[in-house]
Amino acid sequence: YDLVVVGGGPAGSSAAFAAAKNGIKVALIEKENNIAETVRTSGVTWIESIKEFGIPNDCYNPIKNFSFVSPNNQVTISDSVATAAVLDVRKTYQWLANEAEKIGVDIFVKTNINAVIKNEQNDIVGVSGIGVNGKIIFHAKVIIDATGFTSTISKAMGFVTQWKRFGAGAEYEAKVENVDSETWWLMVGQEYTPAGYAWIFPLGNNIVRIGVGVGKPESDIDPTQRL
């Protein structure tokens, strides 16, 4: 392959799709049973980026109003035209992967990459791991580590040892009545969460994502306690 992308989340699927559109031979590798089986993001992004990839309108909810809330104040900033959106994350990632596959990307699920392959000059020339039929090896000119927080490839390369600062979050997806589908809310302050923030992001059709994020190691609070 010209390019091997490890991780089928937003970065990995987007990279594979963009590369394949430019004629690059790509393998996209995901350790779970399916692309987007587990979602670890609330899916807020810019409409400009959505349009760049041609993501269908039914994959996102446009946002015009941004409300920032603290214990003593609230400010809302509004756009006349929506510039941000909340993605249907699973639907979007699966769409990206399907489109990538249509233009020649080889997708390998249930494949856990756990090592890098180096040549005599100590250059990275591939990765290896365990697939559905046992050990599997991929050789490539370029490797992209899109494994997120786990940083599987970066750790194997020695680029990352352990994250010293990171965020931990928890989120519910719920159906509520009379929600403003064009407004998201961001809450800060000890009343909501220490060393972090809370949020309410609407997906449309009276569905919202309600979540809390906490900075580590600044706080040892379990974010689920603040939901």
For the regions a protein language model found, what residue spans apply to each?
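Phosphate-coordination loops involved in phosphoryl transfer and adenosine-cofactor binding
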Residues: 1-2, 110
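Structural motif
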Residues: 2-3, 142
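Glycine-rich FAD pyrophosphate-binding loop
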Residues: 4, 8, 17-40
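N-terminal Rossmann-fold NAD(P) dinucleotide-binding loop
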Residues: 12-13
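Predominantly flavin-linked oxidoreductase catalytic cores and closely associated redox partners
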Residues: 22, 99-227
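Short, histidine-centered active-site or binding-site loop motifs used for metal coordination
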Residues: 30-33, 81, 212-216
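Generic structural signal for well-ordered, non-membrane alpha-helical segments
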Residues: 38, 42, 46, 85, ...
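A conserved beta-strand/loop capping segment in the N-terminal third of enzymes
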Residues: 45-97, 110
